[in-house]
C-alpha cells in the first residue's frame, strides 16, 4: 500500500459515492401513489392528558376532489410580518411566502412559496379538534376571525402580532385560538383556550397536521443539480428513538408510523426549507404518517382534554414555517430540531457537518463573504493537519530522491516481483522511508470532504451567496467550469511532483494519469463552494509539496558538500 494507491482508492470512492447517490435518486424518481391509508392506534396510555383511543376512521380521510367540494367558504385572513406573508383561516395556514428568500437572483423575483393553496400541489398546516362523547367541536364554517375582513401587518414599531379566532357552541363551550407572530421569527405560536360555560363536561382531542402533494421535480432531479440529493420527506424526533426520517417515495412502503411520543416534534423537509409542529413538552401525542390519494400527511393526534363546567384549559404548539437557519433554530431551544439541517442520517457525519458549519459561520462573520470563509476553512484545516502532512511531504520528497535507485532495482530483478519487493522494503528500512507516510492525512480528509459537500448543499445561509466574479451562488455548480479546469491543472502538476512508485501496476498508472480529468468532470457538477474548497486545498497542497521537495533537495546538497569536506 502506498500514497498513490490510497489516492486512487479515495478518488474512485468519491466518484462511486456520487454515482450511487445519483443512481438511487433516479431509481426511485417515480412517485408511488398509494390508495388512501388509515392507521389504527394503540390505546394503552395512562397520562393526565393521554393520547385518546383513536380508531381507524376517527379522522376520516377524503379524496382531494371531495375535500375541495366539501370545503365551505370561510373568511381568509392575510397576515404580513417582516419575514412571512400568509393566508390563514381558523383551521389552517393555507399559504406562506418567505419574504427574505427570492426564488432566484433576478430583479423582481417572487419569494419562495413554502405553503401554497395551489390546487394541483397544495401544502398546508392544519390544527383542529375531534369530538369524543358527542361533544361539539369547531369546524371550518364556525371557527371565525374575531375581526373579519381585516388584514394584519406587523408595523415598524411592533415586535409582536396576534391574530385571534373564536368558536362558540350552543352549549356554552368556546375556544379562542390565537396565532402569535414575532419580528424576525419563523416559529408561529398557536394557542387554544377552551372555556366551558355550559353544564356538561366537554371531551375532545386536538390534532395538528402537515399535508402536501409533493411537486414532481422534488423527486425527479439529476446529478447536474446538486440539490438533487437533499432529503425530501418526513422527519420526527423522540427522546427514545432520536432523529428519524422517511422519504416521500418510501412514505408507506416501510409501514405507517404509529407511535406515542412526548416532548418530540414532527416535520416535512425539503431542500433549504421545512415546516414542523412542535407541541408542548409535557403533552404526549400520537405521531402518524399517512397517505390520502396523492397527499403525504404527517400528523400529531392528541392530547385529549376533558373540560368540566366552569373550567378553562389551554394547549399550544409552535408551527415552524421557514428556512433551515441554524441560528434561529437554535434559539427555539427544541431538542433535536437542529437535525432538520440534514447533513447526514448518521450521527458522526452530522456532527462533523455541524462543526464545519460552525467554523464557516464564524469565519463569515469576520470576512463577510461565504466564499472567503471557505478559503479560510481550508487554511485552518491545512494548519491543523500540518504535522501529519509534513510526514507525507517528507516521504514524497525522499521517494523522489530514491526513485532512480528503485528503478535500478526494478531493472535488476526484472519479472521477479517478490525479490523486487523485498529489496525495495530493505531500501525503505535503511533510508527510513515510510511508504505509508502519505496515507493518514488523505484518509482524514475523506469524511471532511463528504461532510463539507452536505454542508454546502444543505446550508440555506449559503443559498445565492456570491464569492467573486463569476461565482454568484456557492450552492450551485460553476457556470463557466473555471474551478473544475483549475482543479485539473493543479492535480496534473501535483502528479508531476509526486514520484510514481517503482513497480507500480501499469493499469493503475494509467488510471492515475486520467484521474485529474475524472475529478475535473466530477467537480463540474458539484456546488461551486465545494469545487472552491478542493481547488484551494489542492493549490496549497501543491505549494507546500513543492516547498518541501525544494527544502529536502537543499538539505541533501548541503549534507553532500559537508561529506566531501
From Swiss-Prot:
Any one annotated GO CC term: plasma membrane
Gene of this entry: yidC
GO biological process per UniProt: protein insertion into membrane; protein transport
Source organism of this protein record: Xylella fastidiosa (strain Temecula1 / ATCC 700964)
Keywords: Cell inner membrane, Cell membrane, Chaperone, Membrane, Protein transport, Transmembrane, Transmembrane helix, Transport
Name of the protein: Membrane protein insertase YidC
Disulphide connectivity of cysteines: none
Purpose: Required for the insertion and/or proper folding and/or complex formation of integral membrane proteins into the membrane. Involved in integration of membrane proteins that insert both dependently and independently of the Sec translocase complex, as well as at least some lipoproteins. Aids folding of multispanning membrane proteins.
Single GO MF descriptor: membrane insertase activity
Subcellular location: Cell inner membrane
Transmembrane segments annotated in the record for this chain: 6-26, 348-368, 370-390, 437-457, 479-499, 516-536
Subunit structure: Interacts with the Sec translocase complex via SecD. Specifically interacts with transmembrane segments of nascent integral membrane proteins during membrane integration.
Family affiliation: Belongs to the OXA1/ALB3/YidC family. Type 1 subfamily.
Amino acid at each position: 500500500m502506498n500514497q498513490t494507491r490510497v489516492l486512487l482508492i479515495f478518488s474512485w470512492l468519491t466518484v462511486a459515492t456520487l454515482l450511487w447517490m445519483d443512481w438511487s435518486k433516479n431509481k426511485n424518481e417515480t412517485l408511488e401513489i398509494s390508495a388512501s391509508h388509515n392507521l389504527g392506534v394503540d390505546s394503552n396510555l395512562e397520562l393526565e392528558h393521554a393520547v385518546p383511543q383513536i380508531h381507524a376512521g376517527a379522522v376520516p380521510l377524503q379524496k382531494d376532489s371531495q375535500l375541495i367540494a366539501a370545503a365551505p367558504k370561510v373568511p381568509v385572513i392575510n397576515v404580513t410580518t417582516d419575514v412571512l406573508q400568509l393566508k390563514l383561516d381558523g383551521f389552517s395556514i393555507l399559504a406562506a411566502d418567505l419574504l427574505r428568500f427570492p426564488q432566484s437572483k433576478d430583479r423582481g423575483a417572487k419569494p419562495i412559496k413554502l405553503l401554497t393553496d395551489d390546487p394541483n400541489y397544495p401544502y398546508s398546516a392544519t390544527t383542529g379538534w375531534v369530538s369524543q362523547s358527542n361533544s361539539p367541536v369547531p369546524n371550518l364554517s364556525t371557527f371565525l376571525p374575531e375581526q373579519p375582513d381585516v388584514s394584519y401587518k406587523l408595523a415598524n414599531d411592533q415586535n409582536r402580532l396576534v391574530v385571534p379566532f373564536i368558536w362558540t357552541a350552543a352549549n356554552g363551550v368556546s375556544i379562542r385560538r390565537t396565532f402569535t407572530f414575532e419580528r424576525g421569527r419563523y416559529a408561529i405560536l398557536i394557542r387554544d383556550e377552551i372555556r366551558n360555560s355550559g353544564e356538561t363536561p366537554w371531551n375532545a382531542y386536538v390534532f395538528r397536521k402537515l399535508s402536501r402533494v409533493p411537486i414532481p421535480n422534488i423527486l425527479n432531479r439529476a446529478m447536474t443539480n446538486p440539490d438533487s440529493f437533499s432529503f425530501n420527506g418526513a422527519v420526527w424526533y423522540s427522546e427514545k428513538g432520536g432523529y428519524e426520517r422517511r422519504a416521500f417515495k418510501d412514505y408507506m412502503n416501510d409501514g405507517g408510523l404509529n407511535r406515542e411520543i412526548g416532548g418530540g416534534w414532527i416535520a416535512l423537509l425539503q431542500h433549504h426549507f421545512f415546516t414542523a409542529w412542535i407541541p408542548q413538552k409535557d403533552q404526549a401525542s400520537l405521531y402518524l404518517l399517512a397517505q390520502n390519494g396523492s397527499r403525504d400527511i404527517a400528523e400529531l393526534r392528541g392530547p385529549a382534554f376533558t373540560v368540566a363546567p366552569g373550567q378553562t384549559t389551554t394547549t399550544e404548539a409552535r408551527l415552524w414555517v421557514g428556512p433551515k437557519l441554524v441560528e434561529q433554530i437554535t434559539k427555539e431551544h427544541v431538542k433535536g430540531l437542529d437535525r432538520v439541517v440534514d447533513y447526514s442520517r448518521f450521527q458522526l457525519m452530522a456532527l462533523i457537518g455541524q462543526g464545519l458549519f460552525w467554523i464557516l459561520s464564524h469565519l463569515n462573520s469576520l470576512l463577510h463573504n461565504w466564499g472567503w470563509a471557505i478559503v479560510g476553512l481550508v487554511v485552518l484545516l491545512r494548519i491543523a493537519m500540518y504535522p501529519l502532512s509534513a510526514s507525507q511531504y517528507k516521504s514524497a520528497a525522499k521517494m523522489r530522491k530514491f526513485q532512480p535507485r528503485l528503478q535500478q532495482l526494478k531493472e535488476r530483478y526484472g519479472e521477479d516481483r517478490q525479490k523486487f519487493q523485498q529489496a525495495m522494503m530493505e531500501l525503505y528500512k535503511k533510508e527510513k522511508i515510510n511508504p505509508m507516510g502519505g496515507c493518514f492525512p488523505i484518509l482524514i480528509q475523506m469524511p471532511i470532504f463528504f461532510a463539507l459537500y452536505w454542508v454546502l448543499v444543505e446550508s440555506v445561509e449559503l443559498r445565492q451567496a456570491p464569492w467573486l466574479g463569476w461565482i454568484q451562488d456557492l450552492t450551485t455548480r460553476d457556470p463557466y467550469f473555471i474551478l473544475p479546469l483549475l482543479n485539473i491543472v493543479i492535480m496534473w502538476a501535483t502528479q508531476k511532483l509526486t514520484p510514481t512508485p517503482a513497480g507500480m501496476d501499469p493499469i493503475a498508472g494509467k488510471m492515475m494519469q486520467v484521474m485529474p480529468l475524472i475529478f475535473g468532470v466530477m467537480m463540474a457538477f458539484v456546488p461551486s463552494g465545494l469545487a472552491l474548497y478542493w481547488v484551494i486545498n489542492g493549490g496549497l497542497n501543491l505549494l507546500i509539496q513543492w516547498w518541501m521537495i525544494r527544502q529536502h533537495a537543499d538539505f541533501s546538497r548541503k549534507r553532500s558538500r559537508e561529506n566531501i569536506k
